[in-house]
Amino acid sequence: MRRTASRTAGALLASALLVPLMAGCGGEAGAGDDGTVTVTVGYQSRTINTVTAGTLLRSLGYFEDELRARGERDGVTYEVKWQDYATGAPITAQMTAGKIDIGSMGDFPLLINAARGKQLNRPTKLVSVTGYNLRGGLNTVVTAPDSPLGSLKDLQGKKVSTSVGSAADGTLVRALQQAGLDPEKDIRKLNQQPAVGASALQAGSADALSQFVAWPGLLAFQGRAKALYDGAELNLPTFHGVTVVEDFAKDRPAVLEDFLRAQGRATEYLHEHPVAASESVAKATGLPAEVVHLYNGAQGIATFDTTVKPALVAALKKDVPVLRSAKLVGDVDVDAFVDEQYVKRVHGSAYAKARAAGPPAARGGEVWLKGEDSTSAFATSAEVLRYAAGHKDRLRAAYVPDAGTGTLWFADRAVWVSDGPELRPYVTGSAARADVAAHPGARIVPYATALDLARPS
């Protein structure tokens, strides 16, 4: 059954506005009867490329440290309340209801956040970025491990689960359009929370699932799904960022800067201690540390940087027509929504250089052995295989970048192409088949065969 876009938009807005309010919420950093100023932060613990503004930041206590120091200077007691959600929509609902001051969410939800804030006279601002991927690799379409579906074109007439209005939904819409399919007419889109969609995929009530981090990696790691489409094939940036209620930013700019300073410290911690950060997030979320590291590790899919890069703003502008065509937003003034002044002040004179910096240079993968608090990095995927083959009994996880898009993936879940002396990994079977078609003599081989071929002769 086709759901009309207007009905979808209405349902989304209604559900967002009717989210039950949590008891004891703060909002707008109001002072309580005892003079305590409460700052309420909304985050998504399992959307792990927001960890520097959520899960990891909370566990490190950096924001509380900054506010404690501020309180000692100005004689005010500050309290932080953290509220955890599965997606960005309820965070937006709570922000527009005056119950959350600062939130983090993906690019498409950020635009809805901007639109709803303006519509409900509680405008918001995008003030920093958490994690990004310049090609779009943070979103993936997956199918069941034994699914006969081999490409996006095979989704015609099929049931596809996603969270409407999310970054993953945006990836699905664009990918289907590139494949020559109408996202509204040619598939049956199921608007579901990520966990519900994962269950639907496993139960067979959904043929495919389009979701954001960490769901695709988690399901692949658990052997419950295989990748059908790598979002990086779109070659369009995707990111998550921090949004703040404008009145809060104006009333308490120093507190907002304390948050951004704390976010910067959490980002530095993640860069300097990637394995420890992955373990910390895993403990807080219940996700396997190996999955967290796939996205957040030294060579992970996400790059963590608080600066608001021009490429990300440009991508956000390209997202507006997609949401507008689905009647989820009207016009959104992205330039007015983006407000870099606070993060600029936190960075000081170093901001311009940091903003201009790109992601780290691509490498060949890494291996995590049991009992180790660091990983081993390699120049090529073949070296990863060779090392993994020699440490089978101690192997915790091996990661390799897709030969075409660079998206990091689990070596034992990748699709391997053997071409003479070369071994090339791919996230999806369709990409591997395209490689074989372009290289006479190349063939797809199982992971075990790839391991054997990588061994020194």
Model-identified regions with their sequence ranges:
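C-terminal motif of bacterial Sec signal peptides marking the signal peptidase cleavage site
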Residues: 20-24
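Bacterial signal peptide processing site
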Residues: 26-29
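Secondary-structure end/capping motifs
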Residues: 48, 252-330
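A bilobed periplasmic-binding-protein/Venus flytrap-type ligand-binding module shared by bacterial periplasmic
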Residues: 138-148, 238-254, 417-419
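Pocket-lining segment of extracytoplasmic ligand-binding domains
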Residues: 189, 195-283, 382, 390-398, ...
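Conserved C-terminal helix/tail region of periplasmic/extracytoplasmic solute-binding proteins
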Residues: 324-360
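Intrinsically disordered, low-complexity linkers and terminal regions
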Residues: 351-377, 381-457
